[in-house]
Amino acid sequence: FKQDFLLDLQSVFDNLVDITEPICQDIDGNLASMLLFDTSGIEAYVAENNPKYANRIIKQIKSYAKAHNLDDSFDPYKAAYASMPASAAANHEVKQQYVNGHFCYAYKFGIMTNGLGIVRSIDFYNKDYLDSHPDIIVEKKSKSPDEDKSLADSKALIPTLKDFKKRHPIINPEIFLGD
């Protein structure tokens, strides 16, 4: 269904955003004039998301650290993160990322809402989106999940805002908040 009607579904959503904008302005013009951006991910059902997968790697790294007398500054969790693959074996669009306080394998997306909490845009950072925005980098680049998240979020912001403005020229936010 999604493959056949993805563009139609996107068009319906975009039209609803344009139709509901005047309603949002009538409810509260100040809140409607805010635009909030965040990225998140939808965890996929892949083997890499099974806690046993990560626990096995962490256990191996802890054993290695103990056998080699590594000091207390060694972080086995960061080492496990760095040693795990950047994407799931079953689907390369399912990327390793830091979502809601933990790392997992997920489909990454950006979401924009107004100050009323009404969703104005959802952009899935899938292959097609990334091909049309080569400046967005989703692959892990460091050994720290926190650093990777901040790098990926900052790279996604500008292209997502430009696409939003192109799709919804009547919406002119006065305040922008990004996480």
Residues covered by each model-derived region:
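Polybasic low-complexity intrinsically disordered regions
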Residues: 1-178
